[in-house]
Amino acid sequence: MNKQVIEVLNKQVADWSVLFTKLHNFHWYVKGPQFFTLHEKFEELYTESATHIDEIAERILAIGGKPVATMKEYLEISSIQEAAYGETAEGMVEAIMKDYEMMLVELKKGMEIAQNSDDEMTSDLLLGIYTELEKHAWMLRAFLNQ
């Protein structure tokens, strides 16, 4: 068991768990002309988040670690900030885009740590998530005309 790899993975579990809640918040509270589009998109993204949480937590268990599993732990180690009430639809999209861009940096570092630890399976798991996030970040930037 490599403690650095476990830390990287637990940070991802925490990030995805906070993001899961944030995406639900946005799914429920989005308003305006893009309601139907964003309501559906946020649901797609939180469903994907749930898959990542499970895959990463199971990887932690497979390599002998213990995944974080409480809201307290998530909030202590996550880089993701909870959603603020009163966000505009565009503000919601921008917040998620920024979260994804930050997570891309963390995933890249995590892949490097896993590779340096000869843990190709973890690196591959993180690469798959990275690829999905990179596409989502691009689409969110396009939505915002950035």
Swiss-Prot record:
EC number: 1.16.-.-
Statement: the UniProt record of this protein carries the keyword Amino-acid biosynthesis: no
Residues that coordinate or bind Fe cation 1: 27, 54, 58
One Pfam family, short name: Ferritin
Keyword vocabulary terms for this entry: Cytoplasm, Iron, Iron storage, Metal-binding, Oxidoreductase
Location, primary (coarse class): cytoplasm
Enzyme class: oxidoreductase
Gene3D superfamilies: 1.20.1260.10
Intracellular or extracellular location(s): Cytoplasm
Binding-site positions, Fe cation 2: 58
Catalytic reactions of this protein: 2 Fe(2+) + H2O2 + 2 H(+) = 2 Fe(3+) + 2 H2O
Signal sequence range: none
Biological processes annotated in GO: intracellular iron ion homeostasis
GO CC field: cytoplasm
GO molecular function per UniProt: ferric iron binding; oxidoreductase activity, acting on metal ions
Subunit structure: The 12 subunits form a hollow sphere into which the mineral iron core of up to 500 Fe(3+) can be deposited. Homododecamer.
Its job: Protects DNA from oxidative damage by sequestering intracellular Fe(2+) ion and storing it in the form of Fe(3+) oxyhydroxide mineral. One hydrogen peroxide oxidizes two Fe(2+) ions, which prevents hydroxyl radical production by the Fenton reaction. It is capable of binding and sequestering Fe(2+) ion. Does not bind DNA.
Family (UniProt): Belongs to the Dps family.
The record's note on its domains: 12 di-nuclear ferroxidase centers are located at the interfaces between subunits related by 2-fold symmetry axes.
PANTHER family: GENERAL STRESS PROTEIN 20U (PTHR42932:SF1)
Protein name, per record: DNA protection during starvation protein 2
The organism of origin for this protein: Bacillus anthracis
Gene that encodes it: dps2
